[in-house]
A protein has these predicted regions:
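Interfacial aromatic-anchored transmembrane helix boundaries in multi-pass membrane proteins
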Residues: 18-31, 63-89
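Hydrophobic alpha-helical transmembrane segments
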Residues: 10-11, 55-56, 76-77, 115-116
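Single conserved hydrophobic/aromatic residue that forms the stacking wall/gate
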Residues: 141-151
Length: 151
């Protein structure tokens, strides 16, 4: 697992952590939205690459961003979730069964399939991220506490 490709991808992860923390954390689109550029690592990871290396590198990437931003693991969970679901979504988009899928290459995807894969992964990532970021226990149990919290 620790071959030349893994070391190269580890440098990519370190570069993405630095880019996210130094540049993209200080960019605000329309005063509210912040770009999460690090998601491109999972989207563009090679299809035939080691799946366990993808999970490990996604953990390192998410943990690095969580450590610097002090966000308590929400980026790690979100990134690991899309890294785990990536191949299942890709199989769903391409319509390949398990035997054909192992020989399938991501370079064979059409532009629409790439766009669909990218959008789905980003939406899933953001759903996990924003639900975990805004989760409050007081909103679970009573509607009075939720009303007080929302006022």
């Amino acid at each position: 697992m620790f071959n030349r490709d893994f070391i190269f991808n580890l440098f990519k992860v370190i570069l993405l952590i630095l880019l996210q923390v130094v540049i993209f954390d200080h960019i605000e689109v329309m005063g509210k939205a912040q770009p999460f550029f690090y998601v491109v690592f999972v989207v563009f990871y090679p299809q035939l690459g080691n799946k366990y290396a993808l999970l490990l590198l996604s953990f390192i990437l998410g943990f690095g961003i969580d450590f610097v931003q002090q966000t308590g693991g929400i980026h790690t969970f979100s990134l690991l979730s899309i890294a785990f679901l990536r191949n299942k979504i890709l199989r769903l988009i391409t319509g390949q069964d398990a035997d054909e899928y192992d020989r399938y290459n991501t370079y064979d995807l059409s532009a629409l399939q790439w766009f669909t894969l990218t959008i789905l992964l980003i939406i899933i990532h953001h759903i996990f991220l924003f639900v975990l970021e805004n989760f409050k226990f007081c909103l679970l149990y009573t509607s009075d506490a939720a009303d007080d919290y929302l006022r």
